């Protein structure tokens, strides 16, 4: 008989979000950071373009914008980290509680599955014993019938 894992056992049931989903989640949590990053990148691109054209004043202006956008992005990042740090502790506690409950449920399902299998095995053993007893009784009766026939012939 092959050993199968109980149906309550599951591996990798919880999907890890892919990179794009993680990025979208972070953007929703701190929307000013990606906006600041895009503005900074735009300022650098415009500065590079104006530098290539030889427009020194515009280049300086765009680099100043870049510094301002980077500062705003950094402030948004720090402020978001502080506010999210507090809420993430609460979320972490609730997530740990959920994981604990899920582990208890899995353990309960595992035990129920083992008990069910044990009941099946016990029922098979009982049927086997009943079959053995029935065969013994039939064999005994057959031997007795043979003896009676043998004694009747003598």
Swiss-Prot record:
PROSITE patterns from the UniProt entry: HIG1 (PS51503)
Swiss-Prot/TrEMBL keywords: Coiled coil, Membrane, Mitochondrion, Transmembrane, Transmembrane helix
The keyword Disulfide bond appears for this protein: no
Gene Ontology terms: cellular component: mitochondrial inner membrane; respiratory chain complex
Ranges where the HIG1 domain occurs: 4-95
Keyword Chaperone: no
Membrane topology value: Multi-pass membrane protein
Pfam families in UniProt: HIG_1_N
UniProt GO BP: mitochondrial cytochrome c oxidase assembly; mitochondrial respirasome assembly; regulation of proton transport
Spans traversing the lipid bilayer: 31-48, 63-85
Family statement drawn from the similarity comment of this UniProt entry: Belongs to the RCF1 family.
Subunit architecture: Associates with the respiratory chain complex III/complex IV supercomplex.
Protein name: Respiratory supercomplex factor 1, mitochondrial
Organism: Lodderomyces elongisporus (strain ATCC 11503 / CBS 2605 / JCM 1781 / NBRC 1676 / NRRL YB-4239)
């Amino acid at each position: 008989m092959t050993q199968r894992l109980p149906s309550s056992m599951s591996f990798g049931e919880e999907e890890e979000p892919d990179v794009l989903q993680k990025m979208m989640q972070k953007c929703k949590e701190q929307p000013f950071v990606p906006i600041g990053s895009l503005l900074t990148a735009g300022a650098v691109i415009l500065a590079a373009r104006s530098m290539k054209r030889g427009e020194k004043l515009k280049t300086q202006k765009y680099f100043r914008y870049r510094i301002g956008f980077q500062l705003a992005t950094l402030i948004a990042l720090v402020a978001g980290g502080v506010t999210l740090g507090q809420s993430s502790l609460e979320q972490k506690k609730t997530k740990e509680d959920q994981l604990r409950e899920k582990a208890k449920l899995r353990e309960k399902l595992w035990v129920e599955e083992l008990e069910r299998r044990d009941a099946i095995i016990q029922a098979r053993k009982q049927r086997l014993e009943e079959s053995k007893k029935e065969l013994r009784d039939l064999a005994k009766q057959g031997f007795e019938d043979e003896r009676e026939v043998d004694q009747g012939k003598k």
